[in-house]
Amino acid sequence: MTLSSGWRFLIPEEYAQLGPLADDPSVRLVAVAKTKDEGNVPTFVVTGGALSTDASDDEVYADSVRQVEEALPGFHLIDDFAWPMLPEGARWRTGVYILDDVSLTLSQLTWITRTAPTTQQPPQRFLWTATCTCPSVLFPTIIDDFITMAQTLEVTP
């Protein structure tokens, strides 16, 4: 992935500050906007993992929205639509929630990839998310970076 100007990847020492996410194998990448402010810094997080369900892609996408709603009390989904660019079949979501009296906006690109079947293994599906979260007042200045960076993502299971 190529970061936009003004963004940087977390260094290993900073991962410890992520709490339980620090050891979560589904978290593949974390980037933050370079800012003088402390607290709610814009973040870009990529997660991915194998799906262990026979649910349809649409059901997987619907369940992933429910997981966001459960993880973020008060989360209000604003948009959820088919993403018209690559990766093919992706969904784009945007929503808002309040954390510690700060309005935060979350935008997420979600998609499913498949491995090719082999003689030893059937094809496998993987769910990926690229999520940008920032204070809502910064959203107009952050969204273009997120879209640009998301378009440079390449994932491997």
Write out the residue ranges for each language-model feature.
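Secretory pathway targeting signatures of secreted, lumenal, and periplasmic proteins
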Residues: 1-59
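Surface-exposed amphipathic alpha-helical segments
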Residues: 7, 13-15, 127-157
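Short loop/edge segments at beta-strand edges and connector loops
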Residues: 19, 79, 157
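Beta-strand elements of well-folded, non-transmembrane domains
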Residues: 50, 99, 114-115, 134-136
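Short hydrophobic/glycine-rich mini-motifs in sensory/regulatory modules
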Residues: 120-128
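Residue-level recognition of well-ordered beta-strand positions that form the cores
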Residues: 45-47, 96, 131-133
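Signature of long, low-cysteine stretches enriched in small and polar/charged residues
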Residues: 59-121, 147
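Loop/helix-junction capping segments adjacent to catalytic residues or to phosphate/diphosphate-binding pockets
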Residues: 54, 102, 139-140
